[in-house]
């Protein structure tokens, strides 16, 4: 049975005036067999095209990966990511991903707070893929 890639669909509604939505993603126990795993932001849609929206994973320090270069090759293991979902959906990036040591739960938040424009109602749908990562 091939379960890879493991896909997660996130659907969140953000309200006007700067909303933050928190949610957890449980990582399947299958990934405990690997020391690291990769989370990839595959697709984003938003019903309000003028709204800036950000996705964050609460792990450790800020970083944004927008290159195809594999950070593990440089010996860097990213422990947090902050993605501008607006730039992603408008073709501003070809690859958004983070490599993390295995853990069973990740806490995320999505917000319209950090955008330059005031917060407006919007519904955001994201597709995340999780796959094992071997160095």
Q: What is each residue range found by the language model?
A:
Residues 1-135:
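Flexible assembly/topogenesis modules
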């Amino acid at each position: 049975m091939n379960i890879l890639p493991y896909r997660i669909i996130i659907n969140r509604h953000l309200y006007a005036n700067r909303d933050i939505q928190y949610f957890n993603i449980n990582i399947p126990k299958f990934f405990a067999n690997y020391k690291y795993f990769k989370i990839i932001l595959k697709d984003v849609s938003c019903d309000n095209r003028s709204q800036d929206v950000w996705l964050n994973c609460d792990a450790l320090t800020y970083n944004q990966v927008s290159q195809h270069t594999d950070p593990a090759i440089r010996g860097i293991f990213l422990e947090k990511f902050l993605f501008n979902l607006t730039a992603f959906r408008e073709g501003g990036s070809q690859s958004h991903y983070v490599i993390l040591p295995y853990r069973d739960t990740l806490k995320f938040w999505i917000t319209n707070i950090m955008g330059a424009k005031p917060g407006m109602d919007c519904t955001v749908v994201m597709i995340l893929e999780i796959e094992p990562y071997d160095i």
